[in-house]
Design a protein with these regions (language model features):
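Acidic, serine/threonine-rich low-complexity disordered tracts
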Residues: 4-5, 18-171, 207-296
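Hydrophobic, well-structured mid-protein blocks that either form specific transmembrane helices
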Residues: 162-204
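N-terminal Sec-pathway targeting helices
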Residues: 1-16
């Protein structure tokens, strides 16, 4: 696998699932995972949006959201991350399995910048044979407020091919809050989430009543918009077991323009914890999968 491929996987992964997913959420390959997908029936909104199609020759890079979409849909009643939860994933690219491992942790709640916040963590490591050419050991820390999981502080502690990078950023929508020593300020839109907070937010959504959500995501380098739509249900078999899931199509927009060269599908279990069990990515150079291996 080329360094360029790994770099692209890392960037996309950060946008989607939590900075620490920097390599994993897109490192899923074609393993023994089995998916039996059932699409949702067309909705009235889908039909009406088709009838309102733009005239020929005209297009909009950012189509309007339908009436059921929400940038900050309320979390499902009773949903709350479980302190101490550990999710372990294995990533594959093309026909090469287990190129990387990813651990997502819920490390309780802490006070930061005067706010109560969830401390979410992710640890990513490349595995052999990829590790022989691209050694990567990254850690990501997110401090996200309960409820909508908007980010307060986002940290990247990267070790890639012998080069180490430490980044600690305090997110601000006004630019008026001074960052403490050793911390940089990142100006973002109100309600911006980091990748780890976005993953928890997608888990909190009641997909039965809110089939489409969207909002800004800051990956530690750049601001994107994420749009996630429920497209159906699926029975999914991954190393951790068999799950009934909601199938969520995820699109990434850069400055209002969809990144059409990549397509992502997230499978969220229909259990009380709304566990993310599988992420599929179709990229220009390969298909990737990140599969749940173990849940603690």
């Amino acid at each position: 696998m080329s360094r360029r491929m790994v770099a692209v996987l890392a960037v996309i992964l950060a946008v989607l699932c939590g900075a620490s997913a920097f390599v994993w959420l897109h490192a899923g390959g074609q393993s023994k995972t089995v998916v039996h997908f059932t699409p949702d029936p067309p909705t009235a909104n889908d039909a009406s949006s088709t009838s309102r199609a733009a005239p020929a020759g005209k297009s909009s890079p950012t189509p309007p959201m339908d009436s059921k979409s929400s940038a900050n849909a309320a979390p499902q009643p009773g949903f709350m991350p479980v302190t101490g939860e550990v999710l372990e994933f294995t990533a594959s690219v093309a026909k090469v399995s287990n190129v990387a491992s990813l651990r997502l942790l819920v490390n309780g709640r802490k006070q930061i910048a005067g706010k109560d916040a969830w401390h979410l963590q992710a640890f990513a490591h490349t595995q052999n044979p990829l590790r022989m050419v691209f050694e990567l050991d990254d850690q990501f820390d997110s401090y996200s407020v309960p409820g909508d999981f908007a980010s307060v502080q986002y940290e990247m502690h990267l070790s890639e091919r012998g080069q180490k990078v430490q980044s600690v950023e305090r997110l601000t929508a006004t630019g008026r809050e001074p960052a403490p020593a050793g911390v940089s300020a990142a100006r973002v839109l109100p309600g911006t989430r980091d990748p780890l907070g976005m993953m928890q937010y997608l888990r909190s959504v009641d997909w039965a009543t809110t089939p489409l959500v969207h909002g800004p995501v800051y990956d530690g380098r750049k601001l994107y918009e994420i749009r996630a739509r429920k497209t159906g249900s699926a029975e999914v078999q991954v190393p951790a077991g068999k799950f009934s899931t909601s199938t969520v199509d995820v699109k990434v927009f850069d400055n209002g323009v969809e990144m059409n060269d990549a397509h992502f599908t997230l499978y969220v279990a229909k259990d009380e914890a709304r566990t993310p069990v599988l992420l599929e990515a179709v990229l220009p150079f390969a298909a990737a999968r990140v599969e749940l291996r173990k849940k603690q």
